[in-house]
Structure formats: structure tokens, C-alpha cells
Amino acid sequence: MTTIDENSLRTPGHSLPGPLYTSAEAYRTDLAAVFDRSWLFVVTEPEIAEPGDYVTIALGRWSVVLIRDDDLTVRAFHNVCRHRGSRLLDPGSGSVGNIVCPYHQWTYDTSGRLLHAESSGAGFDRGPLSLRPVHVRSVSGLVFISLAADPPADFDDFAATVTPYLAPHRLAEAKVATQLDIVENGNWKLVMENNRECTHCGGHPELIRSLFPIYGYQADDISPRLRPAFERYTKAHQEFTATCSELDLPWKPVEELDSRLTGFRIEREPLDLAGESFTVDGKKACTRLLADFPTARLGRLSMHVQPNAWFHGLADHAVTFSVLPIAPDRTLLRTTWLVHKDAVEGRDYDLDRLTTVWRQTNDQDRTFVARAHAGVSDPAYVPGPYLPPEYQVDAFCSWYADRVTEHQQQ
């Protein structure tokens, strides 16, 4: 097993050693220490809106079914028949009345209860043979699972903290406008690290238009060149906080990235240009606002949750991102766009306009991650220092090292 000692193997304030990004041994450790033991974001409730709707999720050796029960409860089960272990549902999504094993037709209802076992005979006890459940929690329409026997107990505190930020967007009542899967040719940690800083955002010409170009700067560090942008930000922030106060929307950052098992950060902040949405002109992409907000000028709600997700909530739509490792050098990034349940494509929103910024940003990040993975695979790679604006990357690596160390000590 690859061993991580944060005080020796990882120089504090520096990136991780190359083998922790590239080796098969480290990848197996990551699955066991992180993905088998954490709370993981996997789907949004609108993806499984109706009874019988399901999504299957692959996580290392595991396959999990997320399904909407007939009583509208969101449930999660291991995708393994209790008869002889066959996979029940194929990868992807769909809708079923019951879950029927394709091998011997054992049949389960949407609560996981075994209804029928072919050739079982009289007296056969179906009771103990329900599908094996997986821990599942929904936070304002965002669905998390944990494969651990005893999931991190701090999830309740996390949920209580972020719910006031998320609830006003009513994501559980939204609908999926579209979903995009891409495979990035890099380790999952590089995908997460890339999202935790914006010093590379000059490589995102579509995204950076709606972001104030003062990321990572303190007021005393603002150069004459950036002074107009800083003054524009100051004015926008004053208007933004006044609006948040009027609408009772929390906005101040809460940051606990590396001090707890369920590390997270959440904040609402203003956007540049029209200040309404992640579009090339900053104007709303959907005329039907989420939750029927009275104004589109609410900036962005940003949330990051260790180890595998980040989210953006706008007044007009929301975007969720789920990171799922496939191999040491391949990672699935699933992006989902949510709009008001009554919004109509072609009338209330244009799909290309809605998705352009993050489709382009994801594609650009895919290139950055591939280059980073190629670099950390090179024998010449030596871990480099994180700069002050990259403190969230450093926090992610510290959180990761703590999880692996805890796993190795048990």
C-alpha cells in the first residue's frame, strides 16, 4: 500500500508526489480510503423525479442504484441480485415498475423488497433477501450516498449549514435541462485540484467574462490596471448584499475544507457584466427563474464538497458537477443543468446559450488536466509550491492526506 505521511512524504504547502497521482496502488488506496468511506454526491432529485425512475452509478468495484420509490422516497441499493449476484440494472438511467433480475427473474419492488423468486417453492422466506441498502441523504435536492458501514457523522451538521443557502433555489422541484458526461485523461485528484483555483482562468475566455478579474487579490494589492474592476466589484457587492438582505439569502462564506470528514465551502457572491448568470454576456439564460425569484441579479451560489463535487446556483438555473474516478489516469466528470420545472426549451431558454460557458470550460479544463497528468507522470516532476490564491487546492490535498492516513492506521 502506498503510504502518505503529510509531514514527510508531502511537503506542507506543496503538491502531492507523482506516484500518488499515477500509480495503480495509490488509486486502489484512494478508492478504499476516500470513496468507500466518504459522503459522495451522485445525482440530483430531478434526475429521478417519478416513481420507478433510476440511475446507476459506478464507483470503483461498486455499482449502486438510485431509485425513486413509489412513496417518492429516494432510495439507494447495491446493484447486485440477492440470488446469485447478477447485476440487476445496466449502466445509465431509466424507469421501471419493479426491478427484475435479467438472469433468473428475481423481482424486487422500488423499496428493495423481494417480491418473487422463481422456483422458490412453498415456505421460502423472502424477508431476509431484500436488496442491500446504501446510505443515502438528500440536501435540498442534491443526493449523496455513502458506501461506508458507518458514514461520517458530521453530514447532519454539513446539511444544516448549507441548507439555508441551497433551499431558496428549490432544486428538488426543478427539472433537468440536459446532462453531459466527459472523460478527462487525468487522475481524479487533478480534476478536483483544477477546480479549486482560478489562477488558470485566463484559459477560460467564456467563463472569465462573468467573473470579476480580481480573484486572489487583497484590496491593498490592486494594481492601477485592476482598479476599475475593483471599483466595479465594490459597487456590485454593495448592491448584491443589499438584495440578499432584502430576500433573506445568506451569502457570507463558510469554509471547512480540511477540518472535518465532510469538508465543504459555500458562498454567494456577485457576478460581473449583467450580474445575472453564467453566460457570455452575464444575462440570464432562462427567463423562468428558479423558485420564481423576483430578480435575476443574485450572483452565483458556489458550493464545493470533498471529495467529488462542486455546484453553482444562479437565479435562472443551477449546474452540478460530479467527479467519479474510472482509472488512475481517467476520470468521469458529469455536469447537469437544472431549470425551473415549467421552463420550456425554445421559449424560456435556448439550450446552447444555457450550456455554452460550462461546456467550453469543461473542455478547456479537460486539456489542462491532461497536461497536468502528463507532467506529474514525468520522472522530472518535483512537487511545487502552492501560491496564496491556491490555498483551497492545498486544503484539498491536506484533507486527502488525512483520509488516507486514517485509513492506513486502522
Where are these regions (language model features)?
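Basic/polar N-terminal segments that are highly enriched at the extreme N-terminus
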Residues: 1-8, 408-410
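Short, contiguous pre-domain boundary segments
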Residues: 4-20, 172
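Non-catalytic accessory segments flanking enzyme active sites
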Residues: 16, 20-60, 64
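Short, solvent-exposed coil/turn linker segments
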Residues: 17, 30, 43-44, 125, ...
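Short Pro/Gly-enriched beta-strand edge/turn motifs at strand-loop
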Residues: 36-48, 115-119, 303-307
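Rieske [2Fe-2S] iron-sulfur-binding domain
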Residues: 47-168
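C-terminal catalytic domain of Rieske-type non-heme iron oxygenases
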Residues: 68, 73, 79, 142-410
